[in-house]
A protein has these predicted regions:
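Nucleotide-activated sugar donor-binding and catalytic core shared by glycosyltransferases
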Residues: 1-133
């Protein structure tokens, strides 16, 4: 384990990580899910009200552990690193199907009275070619 202070290299650390220790913020959790990382988060009376739901989501989806205090982090790390538990969390994280990038344009297209196919084309990956001339 290696503890790092503030860094702009979070993407590199997440690529090398087995799980994420952090707060129950939507950005932190979403990044961890995209990187297929289980999470170890804290939720207590001082947690922002809007972030408490994220802790419930983590528990309900079984994609990590929620601690009442980061004073319990050593125990939490030991628990999340139990092979069977880590495998279950990883399986649950991998099973998430985040389609928001497709669903939001489809909803907007419906609101605007446009065909959903238009919205789907707008988020399709672009093909880039390089000229050799």
């Amino acid at each position: 384990m290696h503890v790092v202070g503030f860094t702009k290299e979070v993407h590199k650390l997440m690529r090398a990580a087995d799980f994420l220790i952090g707060k129950p913020g939507p950005g932190s959790i979403a990044e961890a899910m995209v990187r297929r990382l289980p999470v170890l988060i804290e939720c207590n009376a001082w947690t922002l009200p809007q972030e408490r739901y994220n802790a419930e989501w983590v528990t309900e989806r079984r994609v990590g552990l929620v601690l009442k205090s980061f004073r319990e982090v050593v125990l939490g790390v030991r628990q999340i690193l139990e092979p069977a538990r880590l495998a279950e969390f990883r399986k649950n994280v991998a099973s998430l199907d985040n389609r928001a990038i497709f669903e939001i344009p489809e909803m907007l297209a419906r609101l605007l009275g446009q065909p959903a196919e238009t919205a789907q084309r707008s988020v399709a990956p672009a093909m880039h070619t390089q000229s050799t001339a």
